[in-house]
């Protein structure tokens, strides 16, 4: 698993950035890449940090779209749009093979929630993985990654847990953050702009004989 937090700006070329942004939040249906011939659908979620686990979530509602699930594999044609992004991100880490465990996007609208009132600390799934977090647009609502690590026994934090800041990253179009999914993490709510991200959970298969070559 990766041993640091990596932030790369312009991980993909600007036309590719614009295509992703247009597809997810442009909404005019003018996409031209293969398998992208429909308007992008968003689905309401009652909490953007709730990964279908019971827990004391704060009710930060938003919209989501799943591309890949651990149970069913690829469930959205839009997944193909992000393969180049995944490939470029893995190249930065010199990872040659990955298994895509989970992939989704989230969209949240501006709120008046104070910046220090962050979303529920969480981790994405109960299995070793690393996180690829890509910012679709410029926004506020920083990503917060903590020093504390999970034992993969509960996907949500409780009131007795204490967290210390490891890294804070601001959303910027074309920026990607890569980190070990064992770290608890969360985000601030946006106050001034819509916040749109891609969140993929990947497993490094570089040292095994089977996997998806990228």
What residues fall within each predicted segment?
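Non-heme Fe(II)/2-oxoglutarate
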Residues: 1-97
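Catalytic core of non-heme Fe(II) oxygenases with the double-stranded beta-helix
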Residues: 79, 83, 87-214
């Amino acid at each position: 698993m990766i041993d640091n937090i990596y932030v790369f700006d312009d991980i993909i070329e600007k036309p590719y950035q614009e295509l992703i942004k247009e597809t997810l939040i442009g909404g005019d249906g003018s996409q031209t890449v293969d398998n992208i011939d429909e308007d992008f659908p968003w689905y309401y979620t009652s909490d953007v940090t709730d990964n279908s686990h019971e827990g004391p979530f704060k009710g930060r509602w938003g919209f989501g779209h799943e591309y890949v699930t651990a149970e069913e594999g690829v469930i959205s044609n839009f997944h193909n749009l992000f393969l180049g992004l995944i490939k470029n991100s893995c190249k930065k880490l010199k990872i040659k093979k990955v298994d895509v465990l989970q992939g989704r996007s989230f969209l949240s609208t501006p709120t008046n929630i104070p910046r220090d009132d962050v979303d529920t600390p969480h981790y994405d799934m109960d299995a070793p993985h690393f996180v690829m977090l890509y910012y679709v647009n410029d926004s506020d609502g920083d990503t917060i990654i903590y020093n504390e690590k999970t034992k993969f026994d509960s996907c949500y934090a409780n009131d007795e847990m204490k967290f210390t800041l490891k890294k804070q990253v601001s959303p910027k179009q074309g920026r990607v953050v890569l980190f070990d999914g064992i770290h608890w993490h969360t985000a601030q709510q946006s106050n001034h702009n819509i916040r749109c991200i891609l969140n993929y959970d990947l497993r490094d298969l570089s040292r095994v004989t089977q996997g998806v070559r990228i």
